[in-house]
Amino acid sequence: MPRSGTTLTEQILASHPRMHGCGELPDIAMLSRRLGTDDPAALRWPASRSLLAPGVLRESIDRYLAAATRHAPATAERLVDKEPLDFLHLGLVALMFPRARVIWCRRDPRDIAVSIYGENFALDEALATDLPAIGHYIVQQERLMRHWQSALPLPVMECRYEDLVADVEAQARRLVGFTGLPWDPACLDFHRSDRAVQSPSRWQVRQPVHARSVGRWRHYSGALGPLLDVLALSAGDTTNPQASTPSRWTSGA
């Protein structure tokens, strides 16, 4: 989800001398719309998978890699695409890049919702400005990610924002290890990087890690009833894989 720690996660990984942070590339979503046919009335991906003409998938892979590597240094062995809405297209990603690895950034959904609500996102108006709609989207994102975990061969690592800011070195080592590259201490100096960051968190990643945004939703708890109602209707692990009971995330605790 947007506002779940994707920028911090990318900044840590992109500080590794053998990785390149691509930012939020629109190419996977664009390829998903384009694949299969140019007829707007015909089947769209993934229903159009069986209609793929020979060479179309290879062309799509080449097109994506051209965009992803446009500014990558010659030393880059891993590419990090932090587009959060690519979770919608992981089936296509698995087809294009069967050796890809997925980092699922997790965060208290109440903090995600408050953060989205407070940003001027160029998203669907309801998603950006309606708390119940944001809550519903968070729940459905969780359901789809659980589906991908069971249906796709891609390895998925869950990285919780709260764990990351509580012990950045331990989680950074975990992240780098997941990519298959050796640890490099430069990943802890991510806030000194001069790479361009275009997300709303661009100023936060110029500072050392802090936990000031954890539990920020509590400042607005009196106005979050509709959001909490939506989250309370979800399954017990939908909003926090480590919570023992649903109430931990849907009550005022």
Give the role of each language-model region.
Residues 93-116:
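Conserved phosphate-donor/acceptor-positioning beta-strand/loop module used by diverse small-molecule
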Residues 1-97, 101:
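Phosphate-binding active sites in nucleotide-utilizing proteins
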Residues 11, 23, 78-83, 101-106, ...:
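Short beta-strand segments
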Residues 4, 85-88, 111, 166, ...:
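Short alpha-helical
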